[in-house]
Regions:
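Short linear sequence motif anchored by a di-proline
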Residues: 1-224
Length: 224
């Protein structure tokens, strides 16, 4: 799964990389956690341009009767998202990209009880795009809630020793088709949802300071 990630890339670099207007208030985030607002890139109408918007991490299906108290749908398995009731409508028409500079996974250590956090990034310093889905839920009263989830896949050789899932990292060549609301061919969309080759990524252990979701500062990515 993907339960925490980092977005410390400068706003102007994000804007240039993803083809969006520079966000005015994109502060560095060292420990993005479920339930928090996250930056997503999406195309909300056929033929429209890309926008960068803030959505709640933890998808609420449009048909939900009540807003869930717990944040549970933070991830969707890429092999079942197109058919599961919670995700299939979003898979057809509400796909997005979640920009990140890195993501965390926790490795269980011998003896049980303790886990070592790892940070996974691209080789180099550029941001990457995690494949996501978004939805708009309309409550009986008040404004609509827009939320998102991150798609996961089998791990590549770099992630596998640490965790049995990893987020889908989409190469730039796939972004246009993934974001296009008129892209409806499930086989073409499914073909994009594969592990990024391990040779394109890097990893290192980091401090257990990141374990606490209330911590959001450079110590989260510092060495142990």
């Amino acid at each position: 799964m993907c339960g925490r990630f980092v977005l410390t890339t400068p706003a102007q670099v994000i804007a240039e990389a993803f083809g969006v207007e520079p966000p005015a208030d994109l502060a560095p985030r060292y420990n993005v956690a479920p339930g928090q607002p996250v930056a997503v890139v999406r195309v909300t109408r056929p033929g429209g341009g890309r926008t960068l918007d803030r959505l709640r991490w933890g998808l609420v299906p449009s048909w939900a009767k009540d807003r869930p108290r717990a944040v549970t749908l933070i991830n969707a398995r890429s092999d079942t998202a197109s058919t599961k009731p919670a995700f299939r409508a979003a898979f057809r028409r509400h796909r997005c990209l979640v920009p990140a500079s890195g993501f965390f996974e926790w490795q269980a250590l011998p003896g049980g009880g303790r886990k070592q956090p790892w940070l996974f990034t691209l080789r180099g310093s550029g941001p990457f795009a995690m494949a996501g889905l978004w939805e708009r839920w309309r409550p009986p009263e008040g404004p609509p809630l827009e939320s998102c989830t991150i798609l996961t896949t089998e791990p590549n050789e770099l992630v596998a020793p640490v965790h049995d899932r990893m987020p889908v990292l989409l190469p730039e060549a796939s972004w246009d088709e993934w974001l296009d609301p008129e892209s409806r061919d499930p086989s073409r969309l499914q073909a994009m949802l594969v592990p990024l080759p391990a040779e394109l990524m890097a990893s290192r252990t980091v401090s257990t300071w990141v374990n606490d979701a209330r911590h959001d500062d450079p110590r989260c990515i510092a060495p142990p």
